[in-house]
Each structure stands twice: as structure tokens, then as C-alpha cells.
């Protein structure tokens, strides 16, 4: 048996064993004999039509009939759909004459007919599954439609352009930045405006079929025939945010950055919302996330950088600059050698190989060309700098799970730790023996099953970042070793609205990038002038990074190259 394999029972043999156990029971034998007797002589055991039953019909058993003792595995075939389980003690087993047996059988049938049938269970269970939200009786559709018609009456020819959709969104009771989805959902991109009749018909249908914000948002953006959102569906919505949000007004002078920002936000949306890794965001996933709450905050928060979960420009700038530093040939792709230079070669080569193996990337380009795109890099950088979130834990678990069996064996842990030991030796640092390291990690994670660590074990562990860094990030591993265990536990147990590891990293890196950009600009009077936040961003956009177009300028509909970040990869099955 190969090392690292865990013995598991053969399912068919176990089922056969349970079936033979059930078949050998005395009650089962009596029941089968009675069934065989019924088959051989059907006329003797069946009631006549005059007895109130159909010819050939078996007497109906009460639902509360006791089951025979003994182990019966789930799915074991029963004697028949209406055969009483207590038939083994039936008078038919005694050597009575034919007339007596028919009389006894008739009495049993009549007695059972007199017993009232229990009410259907399904009638007492209320509806609990609402894929498009729970219907609300308080919604007055006609009143909403009347308000919308009054709003359209203020526009020329009762047609609304994109600039008018803010008022329409408010009339619909939606947040301001739903105006883009509302406009495109009503077909406004084809003619440049939306008529009142077409919009009312569209919104009335949504109110009748979609009963919460998640279902409405998905319905507005999804492609025809779908009930989910893919990455391209978010482009028109985000293009409107870039065009109209006051916190992104400085981007009007650098339109080539629109598609870069949109690509980053789309990847962050799928990173946080698409928990199934399917590449498709459903109503249920959107409902469980905080994305729609952040969309509503776009109207209230003028500083886009305060919305750190999805829309922060500072976070985009950090991610993009880190990618540009690695992409030395500026072909919009980075290979394994480029990625190895991240953070001064902190990652092990074995882990880099796993990233490029397709374990955490979509699309076939990685396997064919050995390169990853900017969209893949967004996932990598966020996962690398914050290993405490559910998505990042899944990201690195997939990389470490070499055989894809859903558990990390001791062999897989040793496979990654060997390179860590070699790198420590090259730095003249004594490495901890693997057995000692393994004991520490098992005490840290406390797996429920001995001999393997599952994804759920790591999600329960508050120090998953320490676990992962121990096996493939030499710099962070040494940093953890220098900290006291009490300090690590304090960091893991800290509650409240404290910044996440990613937010801390992005804030620090952005300050460094702005300082470097400011220090590189000469001033005639010899003194450094204090730049406003807007001037800092404009200065950054004028940097050498902006001299070479990273994307083509977006079309009027905001089309953007998503680096073929397709969702059809068979390797990314939901965990």
C-alpha cells in the first residue's frame, strides 16, 4: 500500500454483509415464506371483490406497524409496498381449512378499513424553501408602479437615460447604484434610453417573482436562461460605479485604468461571495454575503477607500503594483519564475508548482503555457496575505492536498516540510525535526480524525495561518517562531472590528508606494509639498506604470478582458 493511504472499507462488501445479516433473521425468513406462499396460491389469500377490495389487492397495513427486530440497513428492499410487517404471526401460517383462512382474512381487512387513516404529513409542513426570497404580503405592486410612472412622467417623452436612472432607482425603492442594473435589465443599452412601458413591465415581473434584494439583483444582471451570475455580468454595473462615484472621479483622466479596477473588483466579489468555487454566483450565495450591503454603502460613503471589502481603490492599486513588479516583460502574464520572486522568494518551489498545477486556477492556459493571469494573481495575493479567511484556507488546502482526497496526510505534510528544512539549513538555521513539527501542528489544529487533517479541522483552528506558513512560507514561518505562543493566541482570539490581515497589509503597502512615488518627484523649491489624496492618486496614475496600457480602453458597455477566467474547469469541484 502506498504511504499516506488510509484504509477504507469496500462499500459493496459492507452492503452485502448487512444484506446477508438481514436475510438470516428469523422474522425475515418467515416473511419471505409467507410472500412465496402468496405468489404460489394467489387465489387462496386474496379477498374477493365482494369483500370490499379490488381483486388481487393486498390488505393495507397501518402506518404504525412495528418493524421486525434486527439490523436492517437503509435501502434494504422490503417484502412489498402494502404487506403488513407483522404477517409472520398471521393465522395463514396455521394449518386451517380454506374457508377459515378466508374468513379470518376478511375480518382483518374489515377491521383495518374501520381504522381512520392518519392525515397526510405533507399537509402539515409549511413551505420552507424560497429560492427567490420569501413572499411578502405587505408589498403593494400597484403603488410602486404608480410611483415609477410618476417619475417617468418628468422625463422627455417618458423615456429615461442612464443619467435619469438614479431617480428611477429611488422610485423602485432600490439603492442608488442599482441604476446601472435597472437600466441594462430593461434593455437600455440597445437604444440609449428606456421607455416607461418597457420598464414597468420588467419591474412588475420582478416584483411578482423575486421577493428579496438578492433575487432581484441576480435577475437584473443575469444572462437570459440563467439563474446565476458569471463574471462578465458584473461589468456594466461596475462600469457605472467607475463613471459616477465621486470617490473615483480622478479616474476620468485615466480611462485605461477602468478595466483594471473592474477586473480587480470582480475577482474580489467572486473570492468572497462564490463560496462553492463554481464560478457562478447564485441567489443563495449572494444572500449569505455582504455584497449588497456594500453596494448600498456606495451611496452613503463618498470615500471609496472606506469600502475595503470590495471597492477600495487603494487595495486595487496595491494588487496591481505587486503584479506589475513581477511581470517584468509586461505580457500580462507571469510564470513560476516570476511568482517565485514575490516577497523575496518566501514561497517554496513545491507550493509554486502546486499553484501552477491548476489546483486553484481556472482555464486551460495555466496547464498549456505555465502562466497565470492578473485575475489569478488577485486570488493568490489576497490568500497569501490573509490565511485566516474561509476562502484562503480552502485555497491553500487545495494546494497541499496532493491526491485530492479531501484530507492532508502525514506524507503530504512531510513532502512540503522537507523543502523548508533545506532552506533553513542553507540559512544556517537549525530546523525542527519533522516528528517534532508534526506534534506541534497536531496540537495546534486538533484534528478530529487521527492521522489526517481535514478542511473543517483547519477552519475550526484559529491559527490556520501559522499552520500553512510552517510548510511553505519561510519568511512568515520564522516570524511566527519569534513570537511567543501567547501572542499568537491573543492575535487569534482578538474580537471586535479589528482590521483583517489583508487590510493591514494593503494599508501598509499603499503608504509605502505613495511615499516612494512622492519621494521620486523633484520640487523646485527643494521642499516636499504635501499632496492631497486626490493628487496622490493622480500622481500614481502618471507613474511609469501608466505609460504602457494594461488593458484596451473599455467599450461604451464597459466590456473588459477577464483573462479567460472561465468557470468551466473540471478540477474545481465544490468542496
Swiss-Prot record:
Region (Disordered): 41-131
GO terms, biological process: protein dephosphorylation; regulation of cell cycle
Residues noted as binding Ca(2+) in the record, renumbered to the chain: 401, 403, 405, 412
Entry's Gene Ontology cellular component terms: cilium; cytosol; nucleoplasm; nucleus; protein phosphatase type 2A complex
Source organism, top-level taxon: Eukaryota
Pfam families linked: EF-hand_13 (PF17958), EF-hand_7 (PF13499), P2R3B_EF-hand (PF21161)
Cellular localisation: Nucleus
PROSITE patterns membership: EF_HAND_1 (PS00018), EF_HAND_2 (PS50222)
Matching Gene3D superfamilies: 1.10.238.220, 1.10.238.230, EF-hand
EF-hand domain: residues covered: 388-423
Family matches, as InterPro entries: EF-hand-dom_pair (IPR011992), EF-hand_13 (IPR041534), EF_Hand_1_Ca_BS (IPR018247), EF_hand_dom (IPR002048), P2R3A_B_D_EF-hand (IPR048855)
Molecular functions (GO terms): calcium ion binding; protein phosphatase regulator activity
Additional free-text comment from the UniProt record: The gene coding for this protein is located in the pseudoautosomal region 1 (PAR1) of X and Y chromosomes.
Cited function: The B regulatory subunit might modulate substrate selectivity and catalytic activity, and might also direct the localization of the catalytic enzyme to a particular subcellular compartment.
Protein name: Serine/threonine-protein phosphatase 2A regulatory subunit B'' subunit beta
Amino acid at each position: 500500500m502506498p504511504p499516506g493511504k488510509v484504509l477504507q472499507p469496500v462499500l459493496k462488501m459492507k452492503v452485502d454483509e448487512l444484506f446477508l445479516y438481514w436475510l438470516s433473521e428469523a422474522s425475515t425468513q418467515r416473511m419471505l415464506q409467507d410472500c412465496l406462499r402468496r405468489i404460489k396460491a394467489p387465489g387462496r389469500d386474496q379477498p374477493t371483490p365482494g369483500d370490499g377490495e379490488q381483486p388481487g389487492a393486498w390488505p393495507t397495513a397501518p402506518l404504525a406497524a412495528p418493524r421486525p427486530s434486527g439490523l436492517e440497513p437503509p435501502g434494504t428492499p422490503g417484502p412489498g409496498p402494502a404487506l403488513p410487517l407483522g404477517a409472520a404471526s398471521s393465522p395463514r401460517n396455521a394449518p386451517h381449512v380454506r374457508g377459515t383462512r378466508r374468513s379470518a382474512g376478511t375480518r382483518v381487512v374489515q377491521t383495518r378499513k374501520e381504522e381512520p387513516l392518519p392525515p397526510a404529513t405533507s399537509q402539515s409542513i409549511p413551505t420552507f424553501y424560497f429560492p427567490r426570497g420569501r413572499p411578502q404580503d405587505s408589498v403593494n405592486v400597484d403603488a410602486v408602479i404608480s410611483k415609477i410612472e410618476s417619475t417617468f412622467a418628468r422625463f422627455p417623452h417618458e423615456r429615461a437615460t442612464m443619467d435619469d436612472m438614479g431617480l428611477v432607482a429611488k422610485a423602485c425603492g432600490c439603492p442608488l447604484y442599482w441604476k446601472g442594473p435597472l437600466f441594462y435589465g430593461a434593455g437600455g443599452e440597445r437604444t440609449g434610453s428606456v421607455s416607461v412601458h418597457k420598464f414597468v413591465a420588467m419591474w412588475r415581473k420582478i416584483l411578482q417573482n423575486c421577493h428579496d434584494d438578492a433575487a432581484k439583483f441576480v435577475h437584473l444582471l443575469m444572462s437570459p436562461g440563467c439563474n446565476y451570475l458569471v463574471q462578465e455580468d458584473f461589468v456594466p454595473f461596475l462600469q457605472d460605479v467607475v463613471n459616477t462615484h465621486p470617490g473615483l472621479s480622478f479616474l476620468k483622466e485615466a480611462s485605461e485604468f477602468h478595466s483594471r479596477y473592474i477586473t480587480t473588483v470582480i475577482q474580489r466579489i467572486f473570492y468572497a461571495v462564490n463560496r462553492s468555487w463554481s464560478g457562478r454566483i447564485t441567489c443563495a450565495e449572494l444572500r449569505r454575503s455582504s455584497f449588497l450591503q456594500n453596494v448600498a454603502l456606495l451611496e452613503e460613503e463618498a470615500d471609496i477607500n472606506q469600502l475595503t471589502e470590495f471597492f477600495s481603490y487603494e487595495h486595487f492599486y496595491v494588487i496591481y503594483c505587486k503584479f506589475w513588479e513581477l511581470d517584468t516583460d509586461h505580457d500580462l502574464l507571469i510564470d513560476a519564475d516570476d511568482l517565485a520572486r514575490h516577497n523575496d522568494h518566501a514561497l517554496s518551489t513545491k507550493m509554486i508548482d502546486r499553484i501552477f498545477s491548476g489546483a486553484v486556477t481556472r482555464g486551460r492556459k495555466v496547464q498549456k503555457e505555465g502562466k497565470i493571469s492578473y485575475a489569478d494573481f488577485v486570488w493568490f495575493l489576497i490568500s497569501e496575505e490573509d490565511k485566516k479567511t474561509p476562502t484562503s484556507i480552502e485555497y491553500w488546502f487545495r494546494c497541499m492536498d496532493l491526491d485530492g482526497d479531501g484530507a492532508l496526510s502525514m506524507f503530504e505534510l512531510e513532502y512540503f516540510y522537507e523543502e523548508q528544512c533545506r532552506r533553513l539549513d542553507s540559512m544556517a538555521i537549525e530546523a525542527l525535526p519533522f516528528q517534532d513539527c508534526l506534534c506541534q501542528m497536531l496540537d495546534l489544529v486538533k484534528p478530529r480524525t487521527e492521522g489526517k487533517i481535514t478542511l473543517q479541522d483547519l477552519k475550526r483552528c484559529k491559527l490556520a495561518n501559522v499552520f500553512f506558513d510552517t510548510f511553505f512560507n519561510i519568511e512568515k514561518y520564522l516570524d511566527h517562531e519569534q513570537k511567543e505562543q501567547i501572542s499568537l493566541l491573543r492575535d487569534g482570539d482578538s474580537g471586535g472590528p479589528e482590521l483583517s490581515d489583508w487590510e493591514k497589509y494593503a494599508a501598509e503597502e499603499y503608504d509605502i508606494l505613495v511615499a516612494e512615488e512622492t519621494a521620486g518627484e523633484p520640487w523646485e523649491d527643494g521642499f516636499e509639498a504635501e499632496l492631497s489624496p486626490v493628487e496622490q492618486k493622480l500622481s500614481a496614475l502618471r507613474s511609469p506604470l501608466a505609460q504602457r496600457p494594461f488593458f484596451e480602453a473599455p467599450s461604451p458597455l464597459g466590456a473588459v478582458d477577464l483573462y479567460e477566467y472561465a468557470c468551466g474547469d473540471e478540477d474545481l469541484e465544490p468542496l
